[in-house]
């Protein structure tokens, strides 16, 4: 059926260690299974993924709260799995000179260490079996609505990032290890002067929302504040 497709993949991951003794290579097998389909003006994609690490490598970085030695360490077996959903719908009729695409996307991610170990890294620290990997949000959601024409394109988008822990652990997240939910609105536009040259403009964090993104290094870190940029783009 031209409107429905199913796909699957298996990928072997590998990352070599440094020349320090006692380190093993990072190794993983990553699986995905999904479908893409179209129903009239609706396009959808649903993908499930499962990443199986037989050994994950970590690094002692000052940026992640460690001592900054850059030493790597074996984190052991780790499991990461979840689902991604993408929906796209054009509000106007296909015969219209304008397009009004609406896009929704969602990602759910589960993580789990499958063994116990200890490291000097400030973010990972002492790990117990069943702990979640820090700095990975379980829920992420994005939405956008745009207007497209031969001369003009404009898009308003929103980004939701669910709360996440800044230290490995399980269960409820302690207040001093929590980065809370955040929602940020962005805007992008392009005007085509001719078929070769266009004017582009972007606004990140339209409402200048204050939100947190990290607790390392050296305490709480905010996300990008209001930022606007403009430029020319040429295509030949």
Residue ranges and their predicted role:
Residues 29-33, 44, 71, 81-85, ...:
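Hydrophobic, lipid-facing positions within transmembrane beta-strands of outer-membrane proteins
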């Amino acid at each position: 059926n031209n409107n429905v497709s199913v796909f699957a993949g298996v990928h072997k991951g590998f990352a070599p260690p440094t020349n320090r003794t006692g380190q093993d290579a990072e190794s993983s097998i990553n699986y995905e299974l999904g479908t893409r389909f179209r129903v009239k003006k609706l396009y959808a994609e649903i993908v499930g993924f499962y990443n199986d690490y037989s050994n994950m490598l970590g690094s002692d970085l000052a940026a992640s709260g460690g001592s900054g030695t850059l030493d790597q360490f074996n984190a052991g077996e780790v499991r990461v799995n979840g689902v991604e959903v993408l929906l796209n719908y054009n509000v106007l009729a296909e015969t219209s000179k304008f397009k009004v695409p609406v896009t929704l996307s969602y990602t759910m991610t589960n993580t789990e260490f499958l063994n116990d170990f200890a490291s000097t890294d400030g973010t990972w620290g002492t790990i117990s079996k069943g702990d979640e990997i820090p700095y990975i949000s379980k829920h992420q959601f994005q939405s956008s609505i745009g207007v497209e024409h031969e001369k003009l394109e404009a898009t308003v988008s929103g980004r939701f990032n669910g709360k996440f822990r800044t230290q490995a652990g399980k269960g409820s997240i302690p207040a001093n290890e929590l980065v809370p939910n955040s929602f940020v609105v962005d805007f992008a536009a392009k005007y085509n002067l001719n078929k070769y040259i266009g004017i582009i403009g972007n606004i990140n964090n339209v409402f200048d929302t204050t939100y947190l993104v990290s607790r390392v290094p050296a305490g709480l870190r905010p996300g990008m504040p209001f930022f606007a940029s403009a430029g020319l783009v040429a295509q030949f």
